[in-house]
Amino acid sequence: MKILIATDGSDFSRKAVEKCCEILGKESGAEIKIISLVERPMPMANEPFAISGEYYLALEEDLRRQAKNAVSDAEEIIRKNTGGNKLSLESEVLMGNVKRVIVDEAAKFKADLIVVGSHGRGFFNRLMLGSVSDFVVHHAPCSVLVVKTETDGDKE
């Protein structure tokens, strides 16, 4: 089984990684690719012109650092929770439009399953449950698992 996990390092993403470990159980031979995405920050029309290009470069570098930490955390969770299974694990930080890159990477990786959290943090928080997960579910070349936490929705 080939599984693509998209993470931003949020608690919701960690839950998705843990759910992936539950699905894998003691299965060996799985191929897992963890991706975290950086969308290039763009100036807003109402920002002062005094904001320099260096500001955006620094912001992009910070986003890359956060993305690297997110994939490292996900790798650690998988290694810890799969009991040393024989599985292939790779990770990558990618640039581009979040929803498009997830779908494109799933096709390139020939994923059997995409795993994402139901929400994210920061930029992802505004997008993940709505447009990103909706786009991925409707355009992915494989099945998609959107993992909710117990704080999502009603607990009734």
PLM regions: where:
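Short, well-ordered secondary-structure micro-motifs
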Residues: 16, 44-47, 103-104, 127-128, ...
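General small-molecule cofactor/ligand-binding pocket signal
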Residues: 33-35, 90-94, 145
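Acidic, proline/glycine-rich short linear motifs
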Residues: 37-69, 152-156
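Structural beta-alpha unit
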Residues: 76-114, 151-156
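Short, flexible loop segments at boundaries between secondary-structure elements
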Residues: 142-154
